[in-house]
Curated annotation (Swiss-Prot):
PANTHER family: INORGANIC CARBON TRANSPORTER SUBUNIT DABA-RELATED, UPF0753 PROTEIN AQ_863. Belongs to the inorganic carbon transporter (TC 9.A.2) DabA family. HAMAP family: DabA. InterPro entries: DabA. It holds the Pfam family DabA. It comes from Staphylococcus aureus (strain USA300 / TCH1516). This is Probable inorganic carbon transporter subunit DabA.
């Protein structure tokens, strides 16, 4: 029992190095380093470089591209270098330091000739011995790594590649999601037991190896302990050893991690996986593990060689000249090179890039408000010229106040804003919102797309239930969609007819004899379909939609808003009346919409339309777990239209006029259109006027938004008909880049809309409404930071990781991806399960980046004490800031910006 508890504890702690990977059909953004944020970004970067040779800093090409495009100010970098050197004193001639810095900051690689020089070996051996005697700081410690990583096979590749191939084969068999007609035997017992049963008959193992498998214990924890003992791994190194195996195939391990969280009977799935993997490693390594007992020492020796070569190359000091110095001087030189290694300068380039963006964002906001100040009547501005003379940035807040007051007065008179449209904070809504506001008396609002509703949706047109909220939060309620019984029966029959046709096709394709006949039967139809889809993608897509609407038309549906008893549900179905009032109040507060209601309030979810795109869920709403957010929007709108809810809100101080109506639309991000999801049958006259005004303005809004978006796509030249071109991109099944998604996301602004209204933020900013003056205890701000801001950071770091380390954290080229086991994509048939974003999602061309890999900048419009209180109360967020996983900036009531570093 002690052993079992110890192994389970080791595995539980080792999970930190991977992230749960959901199936591609419900793809949700994940921060690949969420479990490592207790350490600093820099420490994790160093550790990943040591254990997997993965570099998570932007490389030389990305840095040079950023400088060339004006995204990175070299003077900022040079100042950072100067400041760093002033913090330390080195007993080294200044000209050597200058040469070293001037050379290494270019990020040039050290030529192999320097590494192979005999003098470098001599110096490295000398320093290694001295560091062992003195326990010097420069001694570089390496964690123990899997034995199979240290052994090279006859083909010249690490033996771990053979282990990986075995694990990919077995994991694919176990995970398979309804694609194979013949599933893995005994999988219902466990992954480990199914493998034990089958591996005894697997002739890729020798007869002796199969005998070893036959004698393995039935308990996976005992098996793991046995292998670790066999390899003479010290108990304090168990976790590092297990982490090495999880990182070998983080995609497949991540998928198993996800499944272990979803189903009680699979909660020990990672334990099964590791037991199998360690056994396979033991079988393939054999007795060769005895030859790698000094692996850590040899890696340290190699590190010394690299550091010596770096000093000689960057300082322009030949190795024979280095040997002429005494050992203490040599140690000083090498200590300097170790301290000022290339990763340090990559980190400085990254910080300079982020500081440049921060500066450019501040200038945009200031410039935007200076132009507003010029347009405002001087009597509306609440300060005098003399007051501003010594406060150059104070125009920012005062202009915001003036605009706030101006809008509020006009709203109360009923002559200003016709419609208020609440969009998801998604960066793609920023340009669309800007064009809507420019088109008429419309106000836009930013809120997370799940609208504060912690629900699991059960939609009539979806096969499975879906958690429609951020993935880090479990659902608390289930909401069912239903329709009239007769309509529902007809719809179900139509669904069954369609699904039976597809099931028959799949059954024939996956069975030996029928699959031989299938090309003859389906060939003519599929050939015609291929030709039509290729030549006329937009028309064929439209025709298909018309056919679908005719033969599988979704009936008019309602939602289970009120609490219902359902013994089959593990979650409460629907809400009580008080819960409806509470959720409506919370959502309105999060939207900063508790007064001055327009006659027509639209809650706009968002969705993306693309064809033949396995990663379509990555373009959906991240706050809804990789699904469209129209369902949540409809639920909230229906709640807010209820008289009893409005009465309850009135008692809480929120009065919604009787003439105000809530409706629901969906922003289609791939075509920049607004599709109506729910509009009440009865509209007040002023609400109807607002509805018609918005509809009339939409064609022009879509054209402007599409033109702006299409100009950024690399395969587009001059666009004469942007709306038609956008629809073609969304319909074309050969299009690898129907839209950019959330690429180039860089900041998250929490504040009043007037802070950024009219400013072109280039579709790079998440915008969330917030007024600190209405949030006395900071609860709303903490909610925004703990939910929407966290989702934004996960999205940001997934894009970041897929750009800086695409081979490890990306998913490769879309054109060569293979959808595997119904859960994800691979490159070829023997790769890891790729769990990041594709190359086309972050790069414009082979050597031209599109996404700028910088960490998220969170901007809060509030006084310093409000931000300080947030950091004191929210340790999780404070740790992200202090450990450099994101950047934090605030703007106070005087309009002054502050960076919280």
């Amino acid at each position: 029992m002690t052993t079992q508890l110890n192994i389970n504890s080791v595995i539980e702690n080792a999970k930190r190095v991977i992230t749960p990977l959901s199936p591609i059909s419900i793809f949700a953004a994940r921060n690949p380093w969420e479990g490592l944020e207790a350490d600093t970004f820099e420490d994790v970067a160093k550790w990943l470089r040591d254990v997997r040779d993965v570099d998570i800093f932007p490389n030389k090409a990305l840095i040079e591209s950023a400088v060339a495009r004006g995204e990175l100010d070299e003077s900022v970098f040079n100042q950072l270098v100067t400041d760093m050197l002033l913090e330390h004193h080195y007993n080294i001639p200044q000209h050597y330091i200058n040469l070293y810095i001037d050379n290494i900051k270019t990020l040039k690689d050290v030529p192999a000739s320097y590494m192979n020089h005999s003098n470098v070996d001599v110096v490295a051996d000398l320093l290694l011995e001295k560091s062992k005697r003195d326990m010097a700081e420069s001694y570089h410690h390496y964690d123990v790594r899997p034995m199979s990583d240290a052994i090279i096979d006859e083909q010249g590749e690490p033996l771990s590649e053979q282990v990986n191939r075995q694990m990919i084969k077995w994991t694919k068999l176990y995970i398979d999601q309804f694609l194979s007609s013949w599933t893995m035997p005994k999988r219902e017992q466990s992954f480990y037991h199914a493998w034990l049963h089958l591996a005894q008959h697997d002739h890729s193992f020798t007869k002796a190896q199969r005998q070893v498998i036959k004698g393995l214990p039935n308990d996976p924890e005992m098996t793991i302990e046995s292998v670790l003992t066999h390899f003479s791994i010290d108990q304090e190194d168990y976790q590092a050893y297990v982490e090495g195996h999880l990182l070998a195939l983080p995609g497949w391990a991540g998928m198993l991690y996800y499944r272990s969280q979803q189903h009680y009977f699979e909660q020990h799935l990672l334990t099964d996986y590791l037991a199998i993997r360690l056994v396979v490693e033991q079988l393939l390594v054999g007795d060769e593990f005895k030859s790698v007992a000094k692996d850590c020492e040899s890696r340290s020796e190699n590190w010394f060689k690299q550091t010596v070569a770096s000093w000689c190359y960057y300082s322009d000091m030949p190795s024979d000249v280095l040997l002429q110095h005494d050992v203490n001087e040599i140690q000083t030189f090498i200590h300097f090179a170790a301290t000022m290694n290339k990763n340090v300068f990559k980190n400085l380039w990254l910080i300079a890039w982020e500081m440049t963006y921060e500066s450019q964002l501040k200038q945009k906001i200031k410039a935007g408000h200076e132009s507003v100040a010029g347009a405002l009547d001087v009597n509306q501005v609440n300060v005098s010229e003399n007051d501003n003379a010594n406060q150059p940035h104070s125009v920012l807040l005062n202009d915001t106040q003036a605009v706030d007051e101006n809008n509020s007065e006009l709203n109360q008179m009923g002559t200003s804003t016709k419609a208020q449209i609440a969009f998801c904070i998604d960066v793609r809504s920023e340009p669309f919102r800007r064009h809507i506001e420019a088109a008429g008396p419309f106000e836009t609002i930013g809120i997370a797309g799940f609208f504060g509703l912690p629900i699991q949706k059960d939609a009539v047109d979806e096969q499975f239930k879906h958690d429609s909220l951020p993935v880090m939060v479990p659902p608390a309620y289930r909401i069912k969609e239903f329709a009239d019984r007769y309509d529902m029966n007809v719809y179900r029959q139509q669904q069954q007819t369609m699904s039976s046709m597809f099931y028959t096709f799949k059954l024939m394709k996956n069975n030996v004899m029928p699959s031989l006949l299938l090309p003859e039967l389906s060939g003519p139809f599929l050939s015609l379909s291929t030709i039509v889809n290729s030549i006329m993608p937009r028309k064929s897509r439209a025709s298909l939609q018309k056919i679908k609407q005719k033969w599988l038309k979704k009936p008019e549906t309602k939602l289970t808003i009120d609490r219902e008893f359902d013994r089959t549900s593990d979650l409460p179905v629907g809400f009580t009346e008080q819960e409806q009032i509470d959720f409506a109040l919370q959502a309105l507060k999060l939207m900063d919409l508790t007064e001055a209601f327009a006659p027509f309030v639209v809650l706009a979810g968002h969705a993306s339309h693309s064809h033949n795109n396995p990663h379509h869920a990555s373009l959906e709403c991240g706050a809804c777990g990789g699904a469209s957010s129209g369902f949540n929007a409809k639920l909230l709108a229906m709640i807010c239209n209820r008289p009893n809810v409005r009465q309850g809100l009135k008692q809480s101080g929120v009065y919604i006029p009787e003439t105000t109506v809530f409706a629901v639309a969906e922003h289609h991000t791939s075509t920049d259109t607004l599709a109506w999801v729910y509009v009440p049958d009865t509209l007040s006259s002023i609400a109807l006027d607002a509805y018609e005004s918005l509809n009339d303005a939409m064609p022009m809004i879509s054209e402007h938004a599409n033109r702006e978006r299409l100009d950024k796509l690399p395969t587009i030249g001059r666009v004469n008909h942007p709306v038609e071109e956008a629809q073609r991109f969304a319909s074309d099944w050969s299009e690898v880049r129907p839209e950019w998604g959330l690429a180039k996301n860089a900041s998250f602004i929490i504040g009043r809309r007037q802070l950024t209204k009219g400013i072109d933020l280039e579709g790079r900013t998440f915008l969330h409404n917030y007024d600190w003056r209405k949030d006395k205890d900071g609860t709303l701000l903490n909610t925004i930071i703990s939910g929407p801001a966290l989702v934004a950071q996960w999205i940001n770091l997934q894009y970041y990781a897929s750009t800086v380390a695409p081979h490890f954290y990306g998913s490769g080229n879309k054109a060569t991806q293979t959808v595997t086991s119904g859960v994800g994509v691979m490159q070829g048939n023997a790769s890891d399960l790729m769990y990041g974003l594709s190359w086309q999602s972050v790069m414009a061309a082979d050597r031209t980046m599109y996404h700028s890999p910088i960490r998220l900048l969170v901007v809060i419009q509030a006084p310093d004490y409000v931000v300080a209180r947030l950091l004191a109360n929210n340790e999780h967020f404070a740790r992200k800031v202090s450990n450099h996983w994101l950047r934090l900036m605030s703007v106070n009531e005087e309009g002054r910006f502050k960076s919280w570093i």
